[in-house]
Regions:
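Surface-exposed, short loops/turns at beta-strand junctions within beta-sandwich domains
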Residues: 135-139
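Extracellular beta-strand-rich recognition modules
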Residues: 81-91, 128-131, 141-148
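Short, surface-exposed beta-strand/strand-loop-strand elements in extracellular ectodomains
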Residues: 96-108
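Short, surface-exposed charged micro-motifs
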Residues: 18-20, 74, 134
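Extracellular carbohydrate recognition and processing domains
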Residues: 112-130
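Terminal (often C-terminal
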Residues: 22-97, 115-121, 153-168
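Beta-strand-rich receptor-binding modules of extracellular spikes/adhesins
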Residues: 2-30
Length: 168
């Protein structure tokens, strides 16, 4: 025999709302981890591999950060689960050069068995690319966002951002 539970909201015993279901069946999860940050100012992409560029060279403007997942250029999973992470860079590499972006850290190593996930784009004039990954991680795992440049380049504020959210 099947049972039905008729509720409008689910809350923690302390009163924190965990989930709301409206009359159409749409759910809201107000505490579900998610973040969006944008590059605060145009930033040099160094020649060669800079594994921790998001931490050491770039500064970020936080648009939102539910769950405190992003700080000082580093994503940290606040709770275990599967996260969708996107890193987009818009820059102007010099002619004949290329630009790359990497994701590395314990979340990448645990999920993919790799130290870095890479994405490369040919240079010359303005170029942009998006680098996306799913990670299945325990709480406290991290991702930092790196670059790999060949020639001079500048990451631009009008198209460089990082976002992520927990999907399961």
């Amino acid at each position: 025999m099947a049972s039905e539970l008729h509720v409008d909201a689910i809350k923690h015993s302390g009163g924190t709302s965990a989930m709301t279901i409206d009359s159409s069946g749409r759910m809201t999860l107000p505490a579900q981890p998610r973040f969006l940050v944008t590059l605060s100012s145009n930033t040099t992409v160094p020649d060669g591999h800079d594994q921790d560029w998001s931490v050491s060279a770039a500064s970020w403007t936080e648009k939102f950060d539910v769950g405190g997942c992003f700080g000082s250029g580093l994503f940290t999973s606040p709770v275990a689960g599967v996260y969708h992470i996107t890193y987009q860079m818009y820059c102007n590499p010099s002619a004949g050069s290329y630009i790359g972006a990497g994701m590395n850290g314990t979340a990448i190593t645990d999920t993919y068995g790799l130290t870095n996930l890479w994405h490369f784009q040919a240079g010359g004039n303005d170029t942009g690319f998006t680098h996306t990954a799913l990670v299945d991680v325990a709480a406290g795992k991290t991702i930092q966002f790196g670059t790999y440049g060949n020639g001079s380049s500048t990451a631009r504020t009008d198209g460089t951002f990082i976002y992520g959210y927990k999907i399961a």
